[in-house]
Amino acid sequence: FGEKLSLIPVASPDYIREAGEPDTPQSLVNFRCINRCFPDGEKYRWEFIGPSGELSEVAVKGDLVVDADSAMIQAAESGLGIAFVYQSLVTQQLSAGSLVHLLPGYRYPADHFCVYYPSRKHTPAPLRAFIAWVMAQNKNILGQQTARHRSRPED
């Protein structure tokens, strides 16, 4: 069901010259990162799968918080820190050299996705059908996500 989305950490060459490069996801806490937050204000934790398959989640540090990919990319290109963005959105910048892919030995666990909707109490039939279809199309990758979906309390 569609192409897997992959988030990657990127930074400008100028930022890397100034601050150096992280060697593990955990070392990102020592760098200025450009954060993204959820609607409730909680900051997004960066997730990685390492070369040996281990999963790590990092609560990065940084004062700049944005809610748009374009702003995050522009901030990274301007040398304001490390951004965690969809690889498909920065292919031109990576090719041009204005951004550098950091931690290339690590990958984002792109086997999950979210469907946001206002309430589970009175979900319209077409939306329920769509969710069922998406879950059926992705049954081989859902695992924990299916359990999470079912265990959420009713709104």
At which residue positions do the language-model features occur?
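Short secondary-structure boundary/capping segments
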Residues: F1, T24-Q26, C37-F38, L55-S56, ...
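Secondary-structure junction motif
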Residues: R32-S52
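C-terminal effector-binding regulatory domain of bacterial HTH transcription factors
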Residues: Q87-Q92, A96, Y106-D155
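A conserved hydrophobic position in a structured secondary element of the catalytic/binding core
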Residues: V10-A11, D67, V85, V134
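Short helix-loop capping/hinge motifs at secondary-structure junctions, enriched
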Residues: D14-D23, E54, R120-A125
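Flexible hinge/capping segments at coil-to-helix
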Residues: F1-S6, V10-R36
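Alpha-helical segments flanking ligand/cofactor-binding loops in enzyme cores
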Residues: Q26, I73-Q74, R128
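Hydrophobic hinge/microswitch elements
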Residues: S56-H101, Y108, T123
